[in-house]
Amino acid sequence: MTRLLSILAVAIFVAACGSKSDDAGNEPPLYPNETPELRFLINQYADYYEVPRPLVHKVIQRESDYRPKARNGPYYGLMQILPATARNMGFRGKPNELLDAETNLKWAVKYLRGAWLVSDGDMDEAVQWYARGYYYEARDRCQLVETGLRTREVAKRCR
């Protein structure tokens, strides 16, 4: 009888370990103003640019509180990116196009990736680099190409 109970306990344990977990259960609930469609886009661009999803959410929450049409002075959209910064990352449209959530995420998360690299994986530091700019830090670390700011390094020691 003891052997049967032991076998049953092991079988239950193995079955529980083998069950597929629901990835949606790992996602935090939607933030105020966030929609499922917006969450999908955020995750898509975070994964594409290899930036932690929580970092992208942190920047969006800080910059626009999940409002794609947010404007503050010269800054546009979800991640409050400057049109000049977006152009530096490859954007070729009109500034108002940055009020489209997907367009904003495409260029702003690309820029955030550089802040993430310069921060050496420190999320709070990455937010600060994103907000104040990281060109000179990337230049001094020979990371202009890696961060996407330039197609070649400008410092002679980096070439």
Question: Which residue ranges define each predicted feature?
Answer:
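Catalytic and binding regions of secreted/periplasmic enzymes and modules that target cell-wall glycans
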Residues: V109-R152, R157
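A short, structured beta-strand-centered segment in the mid-to-C-terminal lobe
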Residues: N96-T103
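Export/targeting segments at the very N-terminus of extracytoplasmic proteins
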Residues: G18, A24-Q61
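Short, functionally critical alpha-helical segments immediately adjacent to catalytic or ligand/cofactor-binding
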Residues: V51-Y66, A108, V127-A131
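Substrate-binding/active-site groove segments that recognize
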Residues: P74-F91
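Solvent-exposed loop/turn segments at secondary-structure junctions
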Residues: S64-R67, T85-N88, G133-Y136
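Sec-dependent signal peptide recognition
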Residues: T2-V10
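C-terminal motif of bacterial Sec signal peptides marking the signal peptidase cleavage site
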Residues: F13-A16
